[in-house]
Every structure is written in structure tokens, then in C-alpha cells.
């Protein structure tokens, strides 16, 4: 009886000792493998002199801050430049090979062939419906027309700033603007915007909420409308929904990879809604109107100075992304 118990205890002790020995042996082997592996890695890393080829590549992901290539003093070699020009420019140039000519002129300023893209738009009104800016640097050429000052100003405000926008259902809800950065932006083939300000009892101030003909008209048959109303006051809106979309937008700050060049005109357009200031943004500039060949020669001559007041950013602009985040 007692012999069986002693035998069981002895077997258990032997098993424990054996397991302990096995675990220690495995631990020693693993330590040996790990230390030798780390030793090899350290030796290889000290001897190797490979370059990190990713360090000079342009960033194409989502990014809010300005991108600076600290390892290359010629960032234009890895950048793309888009020039947006009206159809009237190509008609005036009257040369089917003008893009190649201008590209070779850009080459003399450090921009390689294939890095400069030329994008034509019909006119300011049409460009306002679906602006698309996809290059690292984007320069929009706008020919000044006295009857298009408001359109040019609103388009420049849209392009030179980043906006965070959300859809508006004007048939169901009232809306109010919270501060100066809050605007209602409408785009479409024909936008007519009417507003009716409301008091604290949601009754119309100078208008009837049930009669849109009594609303105040702020835009008629426009392609692009940036509506600014009294902050903190609710409004009932009437919008031509069939041909126009409206969004509630917040201006986040400057879009620093875009510059607007005004062609002609006595003064640079003011894109700020604040009447108490006369600001001058470096990325809104003007060149004298002569012939379009002269305009492009001037742009080529000053391209590097223009780019220096800009920042290379990854965020692109198109009509879909604009509505939610630019």
C-alpha cells in the first residue's frame, strides 16, 4: 500500500524534473537563435549603405499640412503643374503646337517635359460648375471681364480655400449661418436662390414662409453662388433643385497649392466678403492683358516665383469631393 504511494510520488517528481530540464533546454536554444539573428541584423545594417528611395517620392495620400521635400533642393523635378486656361486663349494663339512650345519654355525654368499639363475650360461660368484641380501645383488663368467680376470673385474664393460641406434639405429644414466662415455654396447649370429670414417665432421677416414669391432673391440663373446671410438668424430657402445643388459649407483655410492669375483689369479682385478690410492674398495675382502669347511668356518667366508662394499639397478638388471635404 505504502509502496504504491511512494512510487507514484517518485514518478511525479521525476516528471517535474524532466519537464523542467526540457523547458530550460528549449529556452537556451531559443535564446541562442534570437541572439544570433539580432547579431546578424546589426552587422548587416552597419555594413549596408542602401538609399531609402521612398524619401524623395511626392506624397499622394491624404494630408492637411504643407509638404516640403527636405532632401531635394529642386522640388519641381518630382512635381506636377497644371495650367487652366479659357478656350479664347487657344483661339488667340492660333498654333496647334503651342502646348509643346510652352512646355519647352517651362523646361528652361526647371520643369521637365511631361510635368506640365494644360487644361482648357470654356468660360468662367462653365468652369464654376465642375472645377477639377489634381496637380501638385495648380494655376488658373482668368481673363478679366467687367460683367463677370462677381463670378470671378466667387470662383477664386472657392478655388483658393478649402471647404467642409454637407447637404442641405431646404424643403424640410430652416438653416442659419453661425459665423463669417459659414457659407451656402450652390452649383449647377442654373441656380436661383431666394431666402426668407425668420424671427424667434419662425415667422418671416418681411416675407411669408408659405409664399416663395415674397422671398428675397440673392441670385438668378447663376452657375456658382456663394450665399452670405446674417449670422445667427434662421432662414427659409427656395432653390431651383432641378438644375442646382446647395451645400452648407465651412471655410477651413487656404488651399495653398492653387493660384489664380487675373488677366487684365485695373485691380486684382477682392475675394473677401468682409467690407472692413482690403486683404491681398499672395496667390491672387494679375498680369497685364496683351496677347495670349505674351501672357504665357509672362507665366513662364515668373513660374518659380509664383510657386514659391504656394505649398505642394496632396488634396485635390473635384465637384464630388468638394461637397464634403476639399
Curated annotation (Swiss-Prot):
Ca(2+) 1 binds at residues 95, 206, 214, 216. Residues 1-50 form the signal peptide. The keyword Metal-binding applies. Pfam families: VP7. N-glycosylated. The N-terminus is blocked possibly by pyroglutamic acid. It is found in: Virion; Host endoplasmic reticulum lumen. Disulfide bonds join 82-135, 165-249, 191-244, 196-207. One of its GO terms (molecular function) is metal ion binding. It comes from the Viruses. InterPro entries: VP7 (IPR001963), VP7_1 (IPR042207), VP7_2 (IPR042210). Residues 237-239 are annotated as: LVD motif. Gene3D superfamilies: Glycoprotein VP7, domain 1 (3.40.50.11130), Rotavirus outer-layer protein VP7, domain 2 (2.60.120.800). Ca(2+) 2 binds at residues 177, 228-229, 231, 301. GO terms for cellular component: host cell endoplasmic reticulum lumen; T=13 icosahedral viral capsid; viral outer capsid. Homotrimer; disulfide-linked. 2 Ca(2+) ions bound at each subunit interface in the trimer hold the trimer together. Interacts with the intermediate capsid protein VP6. Interacts with the outer capsid protein VP5*. This is Outer capsid glycoprotein VP7.
Amino acid at each position: 500500500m505504502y509502496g504504491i504511494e511512494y512510487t507514484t510520488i517518485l514518478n511525479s517528481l521525476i516528471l517535474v524534473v524532466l519537464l523542467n530540464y526540457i523547458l530550460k533546454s528549449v529556452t537556451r536554444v531559443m535564446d541562442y537563435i534570437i541572439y544570433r539573428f539580432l547579431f546578424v541584423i546589426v552587422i548587416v545594417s552597419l555594413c549596408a549603405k542602401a538609399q531609402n528611395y521612398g524619401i524623395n517620392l511626392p506624397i499622394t495620400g491624404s494630408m492637411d499640412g504643407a509638404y516640403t521635400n527636405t532632401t531635394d533642393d529642386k522640388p519641381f523635378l518630382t512635381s506636377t503643374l497644371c495650367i487652366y486656361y479659357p478656350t479664347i486663349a487657344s483661339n488667340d494663339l492660333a498654333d496647334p503646337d503651342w502646348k509643346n512650345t510652352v512646355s519647352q519654355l517651362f523646361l528652361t525654368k526647371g520643369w521637365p517635359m511631361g510635368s506640365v499639363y494644360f487644361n482648357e475650360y470654356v468660360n468662367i461660368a462653365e468652369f464654376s460648375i465642375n472645377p477639377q484641380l489634381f496637380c501638385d501645383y495648380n494655376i488658373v488663368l482668368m481673363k478679366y471681364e467687367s460683367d463677370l467680376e462677381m463670378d470671378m470673385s466667387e470662383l477664386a474664393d472657392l478655388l483658393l480655400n478649402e471647404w467642409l460641406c454637407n447637404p442641405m434639405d431646404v424643403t424640410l429644414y430652416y438653416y442659419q449661418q453661425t459665423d463669417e466662415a459659414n457659407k451656402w455654396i450652390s452649383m449647377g447649370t442654373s441656380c436661383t436662390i431666394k431666402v426668407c429670414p425668420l424671427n424667434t417665432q419662425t415667422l418671416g421677416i418681411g416675407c411669408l414662409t408659405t409664399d416663395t414669391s415674397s422671398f428675397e432673391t440673392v441670385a438668378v440663373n447663376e452657375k456658382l453662388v456663394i450665399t452670405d446671410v446674417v449670422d445667427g438668424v434662421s432662414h427659409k430657402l427656395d432653390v431651383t433643385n432641378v438644375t442646382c445643388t446647395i451645400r452648407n459649407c465651412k471655410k477651413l483655410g487656404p488651399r495653398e497649392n492653387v493660384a489664380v492669375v487675373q488677366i487684365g483689369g485695373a485691380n486684382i479682385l477682392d475675394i473677401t466678403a468682409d467690407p472692413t478690410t482690403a486683404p491681398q492674398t499672395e496667390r491672387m495675382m494679375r498680369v497685364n492683358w496683351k496677347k495670349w502669347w505674351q501672357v504665357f511668356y509672362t507665366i513662364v518667366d515668373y513660374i518659380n516665383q509664383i510657386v514659391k508662394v504656394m505649398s505642394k499639397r496632396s488634396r485635390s478638388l473635384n465637384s464630388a469631393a468638394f461637397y464634403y471635404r476639399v
